[in-house]
Swiss-Prot record:
Pfam families: Beta-prop_RIC1_2nd, RIC1
Family label: Belongs to the RIC1 family.
Organism: Caenorhabditis elegans
Keywords in alphabetical order: Membrane, Repeat, Transmembrane, Transmembrane helix, WD repeat
Name of the protein: Guanine nucleotide exchange factor subunit R06F6.8
Biased composition (Basic and acidic residues): 1028-1045, 1385-1403, 1431-1447
Keyword DNA repair: no
Coiled coil: none
Compartments (UniProt record): Membrane
High-level lineage: Eukaryota, Metazoa, Ecdysozoa, Nematoda, Chromadorea
Residues annotated as signal peptide: none
Length: 1470
């Protein structure tokens, strides 16, 4: 795989005449080793050095008479030894130039200045590579009878084709060999080389337009002037005219150019319609068989391909791993931008320059193309300029062992790029673009450019690279490079078969010694410097061209078509410099010369284990766990295995058109893998449809886990993955259904494999079988703006960046198995993949692909796959989610087909409601709106909204309301909305993209939590969830996540306007929302009301205004009409629970005030803890005896219960008596300094188990709702009383501002009391507020203050002093408003009835009351009780179902009486 990287280099061509026009590049050709690049324009020849890009020499045609007589230059050709070049013209001439290269003389030499400041000190500034001087000398001009069309150079002569139909053999000295000349019309052509009858071309004017020498195919690939393609073969090595036979390329009538891929034995033809067609030779009859036919694809601009003209030129890589092509624009159409594309060997497109291009007015086009050394450079010529684009390729092209890496490893001419580890990709903001760039040290690269081999160890600790000579390796942890210290040793080592790292501490090199020309296998220890003294050298019989490593076995393939397997053994060399020595032992020698046409045709070589155990008996193997050798010969994947007699089985071709292959057993054996990793399949056990595979290792095995929990099934771990270019991906999967013999308890396997083809949108370079992911790399065009050199203007430059992409393929495998009626294996495979995060998305892709293909088919399908696919998905709990998502992303015309198989959408909707899958139910509502009647869809939508509101799925409710309001009244009344699909419906394929998983049920993204405009933008509903993510249980106010509470603290200003109902469904939704808002307000769920207000953009201001008017008109009506606060104590306790707001502690000064009033009293340990005085010591108090006491506990919903416990004897340090004077705070007359306490606040018995008590707002690091006003109440409630955090304070502040706008005075009073904010109380409750709210409402607040005072005495004395201060302010306001004499007398019967309704109505608050009570019960109960009965937790009670032993605060007359009564009973002050 070759893709561009970085930006291209534009090279300037010097002009030989002042008045000459811009260079019109006609041809670019590289010499044999591709170090020299020859460029021909219409009037000049240039010789460039490939690296660095230096112009060595140039020759220009200046004489006008010469141009007229000889013509303009056209094509240029190299002599194989690079000593001469031949140039054709358009005037029947061929010019031959001699090239004089002098390696002993270097050009472009730099001379350092005498000034030391201008001298080169860095080694990168010195060019060590060869820069020979070059001189072109014209020697021969060959006159021809007609214009030459093409030439084919060889060592002693070159073939010249003319437009008159003749073809001549011309020597490099200018002589024409007349005896070997022939005419195209005299050549017999046939469709094969054996049986068919040959015929000559009838037209005398037909000539050879283009020709390429194909020695491994036995002749020349040609293109005739009439567009036909053929292969010229001959049994005569000199190609005598009488021995030539032409073989037609079938169905090739519009060829324009051709080239040959020697490694894969392919003939490439460019066509007039823009396609590239490839042919290979059939070994049976010698005919040409079409391998593939491809055309460039532009994902983001398919209209550009409509202007595609003929292929102008095509060129294959020298190593055969790809080819590039350029196109001409279509005549008569709009100008096509410059187009160049690169494909893999079998036609998979890896790069097209039109992806992401900004189309501009470009009049020029690419006129020439040529590859540089090793394919790392692509030279392109246009009508105006010459450019060179750098490329990178996969490291596995030259190192087969790198095919099985779990990371993407790419290499350029001077760098190695390694992708980040999968487990570390989450740390990067753009992990797909992060690469580890390892630049090879300049000391090695300057004389050995370019890189040819690169390899890493399995743990990516070391990297070894090799260029022309020697090698170098790097420690990836510290980026330190090591090269040969002796330069002679480096130059003596010529790497021919690759490099590898064995055992993480030894580097293996397969090469040739330059001085002796003998091949050897050398090992160098990493612990020592690179030196021949420490090398372990093994002589090889023949020159080796490829090597591969697996475990402790190294396989070497040499030019005699022999594979030798060496067993490697390491031992420590003793001595002062101890280092690792490696000894080898030949295990197996495999000769395959009969099936290998040439050593160049070997693409890759792998050792693996394919055969599975049969009844516990190991299959025959070459060595240990190596029973199969895989050889890719020109794209044919052949298996070599041994029989029980030690002889080779007949070689078997398992796949054709193979470019790459992956197999988990190729890099490491299963036994080694089981030792390194804790794999769950060491034994085989059949359990239902779940299968695991037994390891070959004989180590001790343990009971395996279910394959449902395995990360990779045995099918995938033993599968062979094959990339076939344009033909897609194939997987050779074993089918291993295990059966347990109850009598013998032996394992039996059905040793069968099946080839499953499928296609991917990317070209994979890494296949991760355990994750079912294919990783690819693409080069994306990026436009960068920079300042221009001319007048400071901005200009745009383009460059390419490498980006990794991944694709899921498990749905392709499931589909192929279901298609072949292998549902049992599909269930096994899916069961093993259920833990994958993209499994649900894979099921969706499976259903969507089958549905779209079968529903849009114009022909009836005899055996439809959709019913089988639906039945398969129904086996998994993700069935409803899969169907819902598939329906949402599919055209409406296909819904009928889908739900005819899956069942009625109404039934699926009901099932979603039962399973609380509200996200999926929302998708089915949209389906119902299009398929069912109006009444059905309206009823179901209303049910869903109600359920979503109860479950606090705010986003679902919001989207359903938005959906209802978006429907026009004329649409909702229409009965038929979606016609049934036609059988001939033609629909475009829409990609299904998995939306990110998110639990948005309580995601309180505040965009409108304050009086905000209702016309704000609404977020999309995202339904996708990960496989592990189950439907979250309903969360109450105190069970909500911190994310919900933090979001509640956001807000923005504006006026909230109600949405206008435009249809019946929208009106019904509005009614539901109003009912739910009343429900939340009546049950005192203010936090949920805030979320409800924010997410659904509800007109809460209008609702509260309605409430205010009803209360002002008739404040004594029932709670069902005006929603009064009937139980202020219950409302206060629920506010504490919802906002995680701690209860106030009694102040020490307040204790002294009571102490003075009541005399010496005994304070229990709980009271001392309540006051934060547990660590103070007193000497004047006697130790009280242990005694029984009753302590009252308040739960979440205000329920009271008395718990008996034995109070431990308090020590003298448990109590403290202080004196203080209780003064009324008027305004800010009393200013107290803030108390900074960084120690954790002392908890009372009520909040001992409060989870994560927030820090005190009095801390200098905290910020509170009331600001400095907390300082005025600290002496009342205790300096160490903790308050809510900043987040809760903001939430309270937003709600308080809302209630202030609507004069909701009762809730204003409770919020000020909760936040202990007397200053806020004075700001909010004043004379103007009383007039707005009404005197009767204000009288009710004063009554509530007295009621809460009675409750505080019994339940929480920390509120007693605070309520006294609040009551004093209310009295002042009443006096100023002239309503001091107005009293509020509640209707006892109505109040008791409402209390009973609140407790007994299961629809109005039981769920919310019970949902969070257990959590707060832990916070308010005695810690000793939590450990009773073996950790059994007592079930909390609702406030309205209080225990009968609890005394209601209605019986309490006043605070003084309560204190006296408590003293008589021996109770402590709470």
């Amino acid at each position: 795989m070759f893709i561009p990287n970085d930006r291209p280099s534009v090279l300037q061509l010097p002009k030989h005449e002042k008045d000459s026009t811009a260079a019109d590049i006609k041809s670019i050709v590289a010499n044999r080793d591709r170090r020299l690049i020859a460029v021909a324009t219409n009037d000049a020849i240039y010789i460039w050095l490939a690296n660095p890009q230096l112009l060595l020499c140039s020759v220009g045609v200046i004489d006008a008479n010469f141009k007229e007589t000889r013509g303009e230059l056209k094509e240029i050709y190299w002599k194989p030894d690079s000593t001469s070049i031949a140039v054709t013209t358009n005037q029947c001439k061929i010019l031959i130039y001699n090239l004089d290269l002098r390696d002993d003389e270097q050009c472009y030499n730099f001379t350092d200045s005498a000034d030391p400041y201008f001298q080169r000190n860095s080694p990168e500034l010195f060019i060590k590579g060869s820069r020979p001087t070059a001189h072109l000398h014209p020697t021969i001009i060959i006159n021809l009878a007609d214009i030459p069309t093409c030439c084919v150079p060889s060592r002693d002569e070159f073939l010249v084709c003319l437009q008159n139909g003749f073809t001549h053999h011309v020597t490099w000295t200018g002589e024409i060999i007349a005896s070997l000349s022939f005419r195209a019309s005299s050549i017999p052509f046939s469709v094969d080389q054996l049986q068919s009858k040959s015929e000559n071309i009838t037209s005398k004017s037909t000539y050879i337009f283009d020709a390429v020498y194909a020695p491994l195919l036995g002749g020349f690939a040609i293109v005739l002037s009439d567009g036909q393609g053929a292969l010229l073969t001959s049994n005569d090595p000199n190609f005598a005219p009488n021995a030539i036979l032409g073989v037609w390329a079938p169905n090739m009538k519009d060829a324009t150019c051709c080239d040959v891929n020697h490694k894969f034995l392919l003939i490439l033809f460019g066509c007039k319609n823009g396609d590239v067609c490839a042919y290979n030779i059939d070994e049976l009859n010698g005919s040409l068989v079409q391998s593939f036919r491809v055309a460039p694809k532009v994902t983001n601009g398919p209209d550009l391909t409509n202007r595609l003209g003929p292929v102008h030129r095509i060129t294959a890589l020298a190593n055969g791993y790809g080819f590039g092509a350029i196109w001409s624009p279509l005549s008569g159409a709009h100008a096509l931008p410059r187009l160049v594309a690169v494909f893999t060997s079998f036609g998979a497109q890896s790069f097209c320059n039109l992806e992401g291009v900004v189309e501009e007015d470009q009049n020029d086009r690419y006129t020439a193309i040529e590859w540089g050394p090793e394919g790392f450079q692509l030279w392109l010529g246009t009508e105006n300029e010459l450019m060179m684009q750098p490329f990178v390729r996969s490291a596995s092209c030259s190192s087969p062992a790198m095919e099985h890496c779990d990371r993407a490893v790419l290499m350029s001419d001077s760098q190695v790029l390694i992708s980040a580890a999968r487990d570390r990709e989450a740390e990067a903001c753009a992990p797909h673009s992060v690469w580890d760039h390892i630049t090879v040290t300049h000391e090695y690269l300057s004389s050995n450019w370019p890189l040819r081999y690169a390899s890493t160890d399995r743990n990516y600790k070391h990297l070894v690279v090799a260029g022309d000579q020697g090698m170098a390796y790097c420690s990836l942890s510290n980026r330190r490079w090591k090269i040969f210290g002796n330069e002679t040793q480096e130059k003596n080592l010529l790497v021919t078969g690759g490099v590898f790292i064995w055992n993480d501490d030894v580097i293996g090199v397969v090469g040739v010694a330059a001085d002796t020309d003998k091949s050897h296998l050398s090992f160098y220890p990493i612990s020592q410097r690179l030196d021949s003294r420490y090398a372990s050298v093994v002589d090889l019989e023949h020159k080796s061209v490829m090597s591969v490593l697996r475990d402790d076995v190294c396989a070497v393939f040499d030019i005699s078509a022999q594979i030798t397997l060496y067993k490697l053994t390491a031992h420590l060399e003793t001595g002062r410099d101890a280092f690792t020595k490696v000894s080898t032992e030949i295990v197996t020698v495999i000769r395959i010369n009969e099936i290998v046409p040439h050593p160049t045709c070997i693409v890759s070589l792998q050792m693996t284990q394919l055969n599975l155990d049969v009844r516990g008996k190991l299959s025959p193997a070459f060595y240990s766990s190596i029973d199969t050798v895989l050889v890719n010969i020109s794209g044919r994947l052949i298996t070599l295995s041994v029989n029980e007699d030690g002889k080779l089985h007949q070689p078997m071709v398992i796949a054709s058109y193979v470019e790459k292959m992956w197999h988990d057993r190729c890099q490491v054996s299963q036994s080694t893998q089981s030792q390194n990793q804790d794999l769950p399949w060491k034994n085989h056990r059949r359990n239902g449809s779940n299968v695991s595979i037994q390891s070959v290792s004989t180590s001790t095995t343990s009971e395996p886990s279910s394959p449902m929990n395995q990360s990779c099934s045995s099918h995938l771990s033993n599968a062979l993955w094959i990339a076939c270019g344009a033909k897609g991906i194939k997987v050779w999967m074993p089918l291993v259904p295990g059966k347990r013999n109850l009598a013998t308890q032996e394992m039996t396997f059905i040793a069968k494999r099946i080839m499953l083809p499928f296609e991917l949108d990317i070209y994979p370079i890494v296949i991760s079988a355990k994750d079912c992911l294919a990783m690819g790399v693409e080069s994306q065009l990026q436009h960068v703006a920079r300042a221009s050199r001319n007048q400071g203007q901005m200009e745009s430059i383009t460059m390419y960046g490498l980006h990794r992409n991944s694709e899921v393929f498990v749905h392709h495998l499931l589909r192929q198995l279901l298609k072949r009626n292998l549902g049992v294996f599909a269930l096994e495979l899916a069961g093993a993949c259920r833990s994958l995060p993209h499994f649900t998305h894979a099921l969706e892709l499976l259903l969507h692909g089958v549905l779209e293909e079968e529903a849009t088919s114009s022909e009836p399908i005899p055996d439809p796959l959709l019913p089988r696919c639906v039945a398969f998905i129904h086996e998994f709990p993700e069935f409803l989610k899969t169907v819902a998502h598939c329906a949402r992303k599919t055209e409406l015309a296909l819904w009928r087909t889908l739900f005819d198989v899956t069942g009625s959408p109404n039934a699926l909707f009901e099932e979603c409601l039962q399973l609380k899958q509200l996200e999926n139910a929302a998708s089915f509502v949209i389906v119902l709106q299009n398929l069912e009647t109006t009444e059905v869809s309206m009823d179901q939508a209303a049910r869903l909204v109600k359920e979503a509101l109860e479950e606090k799925k705010w986003t679902i409710a919001k989207e359903m309301v938005r959906f209802a309001r978006s429907i026009g009244s004329e649409d909702i009344d229409a009965f038929f909305r979606t016609p049934p699909p036609s059988a001939k419906t033609s629909l475009s394929r829409r990609p299904t993209v998995s939306s990110p998983s998110a639990d948005s049920s309580t995601e309180f993204v505040i965009n409108r939590f304050q009086a905000g405009a209702a016309g704000g933008r609404l977020n999309k509903v995202r339904h996708s969830q990960s496989t592990e993510q189950k439907d979250a249980p309903r969360k109450d106010s105190i069970g909500g996540s911190s994310k919900d509470k933090m979001a509640l603290s956001w807000g923005l200003s504006g006026e909230l306007s109600p949405q206008l109902a435009t249809n019946r469904l929208a009106a019904k939704m509005t009614s539901i929302l109003e009912d739910h808002a009343w429900h939340l307000l009546n049950n005192y769920w203010l936090l949920d009301l805030g979320f409800f207000w924010s997410e659904l953009q509800f007109d809460l201001l209008g609702l509260l205004e309605t409430r205010r008017k009803q209360i002002s008109l008739s404040p004594k009506t029932t709670n069902e009409n005006c929603f009064l606060i009937e139980d202020f104590a219950l409302a206060l306790t629920r506010l504490h629970a919802q906002f995680s707001w701690p209860y106030p502690l009694i102040g020490s000064q307040f204790v002294h005030q009571i102490e003075k009033k009541l005399g010496n009293i005994r304070v229990s340990q709980s009271t001392a803890s309540l006051n934060g005085l547990l660590n103070d010591s007193l000497d004047n108090i006697k130790k009280p005896k242990a005694r029984k006491l009753e302590r009252t506990v308040v739960d979440l919903n205000g329920a009271r219960s008395r718990i008996r416990e034995t109070d431990i004897e308090a020590s003298e340090e448990d109590v403290e008596i202080q004196e203080a004077v209780l003064e009324r705070v008027r305004g800010s007359a009393v200013e107290l300094a803030p108390v900074i306490d960084r120690s954790p606040s002392t908890s009372s018995s009520m909040n001992h188990h409060a989870p994560l008590a927030p820090p005190s707002p009095s801390s200098c690091d905290s910020r509170s709702l009331a600001g400095d006003c907390y300082q005025n109440t600290d002496f009342l409630v205790g300096e160490k009383s903790s308050r809510g955090n900043l987040q809760s304070s903001h939430q309270l502040e937003l709600l308080l501002s809302l209630f202030s706008q609507t004069a909701t005075i009762d809730w204003i009073f409770l919020f000020c009391l909760l936040s202990r904010d007397e200053r806020k109380l004075r700001q909010e409750i004043n004379v103007s507020m009383v007039r707005r709210a009404g005197e009767k409402s204000f009288a009710r607040v004063r009554f509530a203050c007295s009621e809460l005072s009675r409750w505080a005495v019994e339940k929480c004395c920390g509120y007693v002093a605070l309520l006294q201060a609040f009551d004093a302010h209310l009295a002042v306001v009443a006096e100023q408003a002239g309503c001091a004499d107005l009293k509020f007398s509640p209707d006892n019967e109505n109040r008791k009835a409402s209390q009973k309704t609140s407790a007994d109505d299961p629809k109005r608050g039981r769920r919310r009351a019970d949902s969070g009570s257990s959590k707060l019960n832990n916070s308010f109960s005695n810690p000793k009780l939590n450990g009773m009965n073996g950790g059994r937790r007592e079930r909390s009670r609702s406030a309205d179902r209080a225990h009968k032993s609890v005394k209601r605060y209605d019986d309490v007359v006043c605070a003084e009486d309560a204190l006296e009564k408590a003293n008589e009973e021996g109770c402590s002050i709470m």
